[in-house]
């Protein structure tokens, strides 16, 4: 009996589909404070780079802003651009951290991806930046 799933793949896009251009920063009026800002979404998704099967996660972005905040609609569009990108879970979390640090230059940032179980294993990835 042949494995009818062996040759099946879904469309998988490369990293070039990650839309960093949509990200916008807005001025932060309290740079002298160490206020912690936290954004949480249960809707993050990307795909396995080998099979195209979806990887879904709860994503938490926590940071201490310096001069800038991320504009939330732009963040939503940016995160949605990962939807059909073939990227490892560990790489997705680090890429998000790198892109947001470049945009915002925060005092501190942490991105946590809690990926839902696949093959009996769930994955939690924590990436941090400190100035």
Curated annotation (Swiss-Prot):
* EC annotation from Swiss-Prot or TrEMBL: 1.7.1.13
Q: Which InterPro entries match?
A: GTP-CH-I_C/QueF, NADPH_dep_7-cyano-7-deazaG_red, QueF, QueF_type1
In the record, the note on similarity to other proteins reads: Belongs to the GTP cyclohydrolase I family. QueF type 1 subfamily.
Q: In which pathway does it act?
A: tRNA modification; tRNA-queuosine biosynthesis
Q: What is its main location?
A: cytoplasm
Gene Ontology CC annotation, any one: cytoplasm
Q: What does this protein do?
A: Catalyzes the NADPH-dependent reduction of 7-cyano-7-deazaguanine (preQ0) to 7-aminomethyl-7-deazaguanine (preQ1).
> What organism, scientifically named, is this protein from?
Caldicellulosiruptor bescii (strain ATCC BAA-1888 / DSM 6725 / KCTC 15123 / Z-1320)
- Subcellular location per the Swiss-Prot or TrEMBL entry: Cytoplasm
Active site residues of this protein: 48, 55
Q: Which UniProt keywords apply?
A: Cytoplasm, NADP, Oxidoreductase, Queuosine biosynthesis
- A GO term for molecular function: preQ1 synthase activity
Q: Which domain of life is it from?
A: Bacteria
Q: What is this protein called?
A: NADPH-dependent 7-cyano-7-deazaguanine reductase
Give the reaction(s) catalysed. 7-aminomethyl-7-carbaguanine + 2 NADP(+) = 7-cyano-7-deazaguanine + 2 NADPH + 3 H(+)
Amino acids binding substrate: 70-72, 89-90
Q: Name one GO biological process term.
A: tRNA modification
């Amino acid at each position: 009996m042949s494995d009818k799933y062996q040759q099946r793949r879904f469309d998988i896009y490369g990293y070039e589909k990650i839309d960093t251009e949509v990200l916008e920063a807005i001025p932060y009026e309290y740079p002298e404070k160490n206020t912690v800002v936290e954004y949480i979404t249960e809707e993050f998704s990307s795909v396995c780079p080998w099979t195209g099967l979806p990887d879904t996660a709860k994503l938490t972005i926590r940071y201490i802003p310096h001069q800038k905040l991320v504009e939330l609609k732009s963040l939503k569009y940016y995160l949605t651009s990962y939807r059909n990108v073939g990227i490892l879970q560990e790489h997705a979390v680090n890429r998000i951290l790198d892109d947001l640090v470049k945009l915002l230059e925060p005092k501190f940032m942490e991105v946590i991806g809690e990926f839902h179980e696949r093959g009996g294993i769930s994955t939690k990835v924590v990436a941090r930046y400190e100035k």
